[in-house]
Amino acid sequence: MKDKTVVITGATSGLGRATALQLARKGALVVGVARNESKANELVKEIEKHGGKGQFVVADLSSMKDTAGAGRSIAGSVDRLDILINNAGAHFPKYGVTSEDFEFTLALNYLSPFLLTHHLMDKIEQTAAEHGEARIVNISSIMHKAPINWDNLNYGDGGYRSTVAYYQSKHMLTSFTYLLSRKLKESGITVNCIHPGFVKTALAKSDYPFPMNVIVPIVGLFIGEPPERAADTPVWLASSDEAKRMNGEYIHHRKAKKSWPPTRDKDA
């Protein structure tokens, strides 16, 4: 990973933080994108303490304005972009819309990675042309198995269900992965998505409504993985020679799996 540049969203906590630290230890320049500046500075210090290189762009990725700005800033500040890891995402128990009138789950989990990838694509394509390859990794989830309600995608007609909104967002991100991998298949750029497993830090959050705020952390004690272990597949997919051959795949524990059939529908 020496001399390579990695961009990771949501890099200050959980899976994103663990992935950033491990890739930095492998020699990559890690460019994180996150909204909490103090946490970002702490992570850069941690990276540098171990001899790595890190820098940050502060942005609220639920904002399309901030996302576009972050993309332009990164594209203008790095010489190459070898790996983009779209990791940032969240579950929003209560309905809300951003200042741009997008439902929060839709904005953060799908629209933002779509837009950030768009703004970084020229730099990624340039890197692939000059150095032979580049990689895009989208953090999806096993929780992508819900049909998309295109008629009420933003929940403007009411009926918000947080779990369904989350499933739909990961459905869209998974489908986007397949579409982009086909589009870029002759470019030297691979595009894959990952179900990282159930990460303890995410499962321990208590912002779910009752009784889920009690059930979810308990479930996490039994099936959740610590972020350091869950980062194994993202790090492997971003850095290994073996993963270089994988493209257009839904991956769990380093193995290609079949996602829900509607996500693979080329005509959808």
Enumerate the language-model features and the residues they cover.
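Conserved glycine-rich cofactor-binding loop
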Residues: T5, T12-S13
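N-terminal Rossmann-fold NAD(P) dinucleotide-binding loop
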Residues: G16-R17
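Conserved glycine-rich Rossmann-like NAD(P)H-binding loop of the short-chain dehydrogenase/reductase
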Residues: K26-E42
